[in-house]
Amino acid sequence: MAVREAAIRAIRRLVGWNPDVLVVVGDAPRTAAYAAGQSGSLAGFGVPRSVTLGRATHHGRQCGGQPTSSLSLSLTVGAWLLEQTSWRGDVAGFGVSAMTAVRDAVQIGVALARWAARVALLVMADGSARRTAAAPGGFDERAAAHDATVAAALAAADASALLRLEPDLSRELMAAGRASWQVLAGASLIAGSSDTHVRSCVSRAEYVDAPYGVGYVVAFWEWGSR
């Protein structure tokens, strides 16, 4: 599938940055932290397979939230994609509830970005699940415009645009990724600056489509040293 191939390419670029820790962020029933070694199931996709998040050798620093034992589906998919790469370093997960307020999502992102000197975020976030009549939530004429806004923001590393996404509208459109994108926006506030200068950011959308009536974007944001 094209989206999976694009995601793996983007993740390989991410791990090639050699971060101190890689945090998989995604929607979850409640806001919670996950440590390496915790597992989840792909049964939600009809695949009877268990997936483990990295190795159970994480250095133990807490990234906030209430620790839990079973990965949410979004984090399980992220862990599965991460298995397809050469990453063997420190990894953790952070699940974000769809009920998370914008300001709280930003605070989570800021905290994650400060967790280590070099933090990489793998953000697993779906667009609207109401793009077509056959979509999981049926058709909503607002869905395409919503997802176009998200795709443009991710392509341009436009954190401000992500922060303008409305929680109520996102829930109506079944756009599960809203809070996770806003965590990314919060983290970018730290990644994009230092004590002495503003860092430049290279960003690009590698994939934008809506297979099965669900909006997906694969993009990367990478900050330079100046």
Predicted feature residues:
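Cap/lid and interdomain-hinge subdomains that line or gate substrate/regulatory clefts
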Residues: 53-110
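A short aromatic-anchored loop/beta-hairpin motif
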Residues: 1-64, 69
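Polyanion-binding loop/helix "lid" in catalytic or ligand-binding cores
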Residues: 10, 154-208
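Active-site beta-strand/loop microenvironment that shapes enzyme catalytic pockets
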Residues: 99-149
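Short, basic/aromatic-enriched C-terminal tail that caps enzymatic domains
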Residues: 211-226
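Actinobacteria-biased recognition of intrinsically disordered, low-complexity terminal regions
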Residues: 9, 59-63, 193-196, 222-226
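Solvent-exposed alpha-helices and their adjacent loops that cap or buttress functional pockets
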Residues: 15-16, 112-116, 211
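Short beta-strand segments
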Residues: 23-28, 95-97, 122-126
